[in-house]
């Protein structure tokens, strides 16, 4: 039996729409992500589901992304004349669906890593990552790696998709705290993409390119202040903020409390606020608990960048 944990991720980081993402883990040691357990069977295949958010999963097994991961993995194995082993997969669904924290990526990554390890790792990291992106595209409507890449590999990942590399890890700022607030409501990735305009002004494109280039430069040259200042979004946030509860006021309040940057995590509704120290992070956490959460399913976590990515649990 093998248990694989895949951590939550925050995509875009405001400045890198579909090109940046980071894996995150709560500083209290709790697991913010999904777990997939795999075990051998005498014959056949079984899929089971458990976890706090299991009730949000599709009733039909064929619509479960873990089942689809199994089918895709099996198809790729057959192309190499390798038989899939009889097995049972159990998804522990601990991530809310449509949260902006890479919920589908967690399930996809945990499932494919478990399947690959169970079969003595026939696929390389890049081959596995390509499969992860394909599965993510089935849910969101387009292939993108800004959740699956950091969830799988850890760290802050920049999507390059050239010279045989899907992504490359950026050096980042270990001193930063990420305060992530999920309000308890759902925003589908497809809906959040549909709300975006079909075209942008030249000035918006230039601004976003300048911000992203400056952000990447700041990461490599260890300029934390510049990196934080460049975490701006003119591509998605102006349109997606309508899907989030009182976002503009909450964003301003977090900045007043000392946040270095505040933005939408992925397609929302989770938001992130970056704090320079633990004291500021705790103030932000308290504020967001009181002013952004909408129901009992909402939560706030103080996190750091997770540099491990998907991993086996003892």
UniProtKB/Swiss-Prot annotation:
Q: InterPro entries, from UniProt?
A: GHMP_kinase_C_dom, GHMP_kinase_C_sf, GHMP_kinase_N_dom, GHMP_knse_ATP-bd_CS, Homoserine_kinase, Ribosomal_Su5_D2-typ_SF, Ribsml_uS5_D2-typ_fold_subgr
GO CC, sorted alphabetically, is: cytoplasm
Question: Any idea which UniProt keywords this protein has?
Answer: Amino-acid biosynthesis, ATP-binding, Cytoplasm, Kinase, Nucleotide-binding, Threonine biosynthesis, Transferase
- In which domain of life is the source organism classified? Bacteria
Cellular location(s): Cytoplasm
Q: Which GO molecular-function terms appear in the entry?
A: ATP binding; homoserine kinase activity
Which chemical reaction does it catalyze? L-homoserine + ATP = O-phospho-L-homoserine + ADP + H(+)
Q: What is its EC number?
A: 2.7.1.39
Q: Which PROSITE patterns does UniProt cross-reference here? A: GHMP_KINASES_ATP
* GO terms for biological process, alphabetical: threonine biosynthetic process
The UniProt annotation places ATP binding at 96-106
What is the name attached to this protein's record?
Homoserine kinase
Please report the organism this UniProt entry assigns to the protein.
Pasteurella multocida (strain Pm70)
The gene it comes from is thrB
